[in-house]
Amino acid sequence: MTLRIFDSASRQLRDFVPLREGRASVYLCGATVQSAPHIGHLRSGVAFDILRNWLTYMGLDVAFIRNVTDIDDKILNKAAEHNRPWWEWAATYEREFQWAYDQLGVTPPSLEPHATGHVPEMIEYMQRIIDAGHGYAVDGNVYLSPMSLPDYGSLSGQKLDEMDQGESAGTGKRDPRDFTLWKAAKPGEPSWDTPWGRGRPGWHLECTTMATKYLGAEFDIHAGGLDLKFPHHENEIAQAHAAGDGFARYWMHNGWVTMAGEKMSKSLGNVLSVPNLLQIVRPVELRYYLGSAHYRSMLEFSEDALREAAAGYRRLEKFVHAASSVAGKNDRTLGRSEVTDAFTDAMNDDIGVPAALAEVHKVVRSSNSRLDAARRGDSDAVESVVSAGEQVRAMLGVLGVDPLDEKWQEIAAESGAEHDALDTLVRAELDIRAKARAEKDWATADAVRDRLAAAGIVVTDTPSGAEWELSEQ
């Protein structure tokens, strides 16, 4: 089955055929580093990291660009409100975004260009638009006229006579529907020299310029949040077409994280930060939660849903560790094999993570029944459990949540001292229990087990001794 993705521009599922054989090119609108990231921002990073992983698994060499918008009205306004240099403000929150991406195991992009590093290219791009008759300069501002482009509005379905660019009328606009490519300099704001006077770039121009610089005039996929479809992505297309570039061949948009049915946003005061949520669940569990819904669907946040997802992940993790233990006791290493056919079909159906996860859980459920026999050394059971474990690792690897992946081991190591301390205490209790069992002191053995259960610790007896884990409740 060929990968099919829902193209927002054509509003239909389309077979994904890369522009260049064996390669895939993806541009993701990254962060505007105006304030701390919340999980609404991070959902996009996780969703399209999974896309990237699947393209890579399919054997494609993926060029993945995720930009940083480090000059913007909101950045300037917030920096001014707090009496801080704009560049320092942007750098501070860029570091916070990077930390959050790292915590959630998001693979770094192939390149992460910054808007402020591409002003010469933006000036050149504007000149092409003006030369083609689609743009004009007035009093240091540069505008683009959507009315000059017959396909304007095709992505978002916006009607020209009803659209609102969400910006002020501007000095010298010929039509209120025209949008800004370049903003004339204002006192106290950063600015750069151009043939039309000093100023700074508009948001839309930044992305079109960087996407085409690194991926070419035409590339495969442009991705981003649903809220960016208009005006941002519509205007990116307009700029590219005005300059004569074909631009993105497929458009993918992820749904919002919502609370009480409303989009998570700072303006509504319903923001959940990554550090706060990591007080409730581990980073890998938060990633699992954010990636578990279909990328195009809305994800309604609740703490109960987050905890439920974390419990679901722990069931998968428990099996992988058990399979790894079985492999180790039989002088084998639990690697990664191939994903199942059902998993492949799910992922090829518009990156259908819910169906893909259902397949992972199915494999785990069917294999758990053979764990006891495998622990006893039954050769058929060992082979079955290890084979299933390697399949599960492969599938979870595509989703970015393989429990044995080094990145999760490194992140877990940050809090490893706490786990080691707990393990020492639990092992002391288990030693008491083991001694009592050897002496047939069942009352003491049961009392130890009950104490541990009351503390949320589940004990499992295996041929090689007792093992413990935290309860899923």
UniProtKB/Swiss-Prot annotation:
It comes from Corynebacterium kroppenstedtii (strain DSM 44385 / JCM 11950 / CIP 105744 / CCUG 35717). GO terms for molecular function: ATP binding; cysteine-tRNA ligase activity; zinc ion binding. The gene is cysS. Zn(2+) binds at residues 29, 207, 232, 236. Its cofactor is Zn(2+). It is found in: Cytoplasm. Monomer. GO terms for biological process: cysteinyl-tRNA aminoacylation. It catalyses: tRNA(Cys) + L-cysteine + ATP = L-cysteinyl-tRNA(Cys) + AMP + diphosphate. Binds 1 zinc ion per subunit. A motif ('KMSKS' region) lies at residues 263-267. A motif ('HIGH' region) lies at residues 31-41. Its EC number is 6.1.1.16. This is Cysteine--tRNA ligase. Keywords: Aminoacyl-tRNA synthetase, ATP-binding, Cytoplasm, Ligase, Metal-binding, Nucleotide-binding, Protein biosynthesis, Zinc.
